[in-house]
């Protein structure tokens, strides 16, 4: 249990940060799933459109430090390859 005022404040800040970060991580997962669904559906135009939006989301989350930049690059690379492989 936090005893000092500083420790109590950090607990409050950590709760806010955890909620914000979990929301952003959820947004990331949703963006990735939407691209995967478009690929499975076989709609290349939709997949490319959703892919461009998801790249923006992935980059913004990486820039905020929620995920590492290499993880962001890995997601973008794999999604890009999957979209291009649709033919």
From Swiss-Prot:
Q: Which UniProt keywords apply?
A: Ribonucleoprotein, Ribosomal protein, RNA-binding, rRNA-binding
Residues covered by region (Disordered): 1-26
Gene Ontology cellular-component terms listed: cytosol; small ribosomal subunit
Q: Do you know which SUPFAM superfamilies this protein is assigned to?
A: Ribosomal protein S20
A GO BP annotation: translation
GO MF terms listed in the record are: small ribosomal subunit rRNA binding; structural constituent of ribosome
Q: Which InterPro entries match?
A: Ribosomal_bS20, Ribosomal_bS20_sf
Q: Which family does it belong to?
A: Belongs to the bacterial ribosomal protein bS20 family.
What does this protein do, in the record's words? Binds directly to 16S ribosomal RNA.
What this protein is called in its record is: Small ribosomal subunit protein bS20
What is the protein's species of origin? Answer: Nitrosomonas eutropha (strain DSM 101675 / C91 / Nm57)
């Amino acid at each position: 249990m936090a005893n000092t005022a500083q420790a109590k404040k950090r607990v409050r800040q950590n709760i806010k940060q955890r909620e914000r970060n979990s929301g952003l991580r959820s947004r990331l997962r949703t963006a990735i799933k939407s691209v995967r669904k478009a690929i499975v559906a076989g709609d290349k135009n939709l997949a490319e459109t959703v892919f461009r939006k998801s790249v923006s989301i992935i980059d913004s989350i990486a820039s905020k430090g929620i995920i590492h930049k290499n993880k962001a690059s890995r997601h973008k690379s794999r999604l890009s390859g999957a979209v291009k492989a649709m033919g």
